[in-house]
Regions:
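Solvent-exposed alpha-helical segments within well-ordered globular domains of core cellular machineries
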Residues: 7, 26-33, 37-40, 61
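Alpha-helical coiled-coil heptad-repeat segments used for dimerization/assembly
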Residues: 30, 37, 44, 64, ...
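Long, hydrophobic or amphipathic alpha-helical segments
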Residues: 52-55, 59-73
Length: 74
């Protein structure tokens, strides 16, 4: 099995321990930071919303960004 490194990332003020290959640590940290930013954007745009809904809305926004970028490349 390939070597894994366990790191702690903070997303929306919650800490998560995640394992990944050592050469992917920075990408994982960047991804966690990006998700945290997107969740905070969703939260600031609405007054009252539960954490699960914030996470789903952020995921939908990120998926839309990815699909739009893929279409523009094609």
């Amino acid at each position: 099995m390939a070597e894994q490194e366990t790191i702690s990332v903070s997303i929306f003020d919650k800490s998560f321990k995640v394992s990944c290959p050592p050469d992917e640590v920075q990408a994982l940290r960047d991804s966690a930071h990006y998700l945290d930013k997107k969740m905070r954007e969703v939260k600031s745009a609405r007054t009252v919303m539960g954490l699960d809904r914030i996470a789903v809305m952020a995921a939908l926004n990120i998926a839309n960004e990815l699909l739009t970028a893929n279409k523009q490349r094609d």
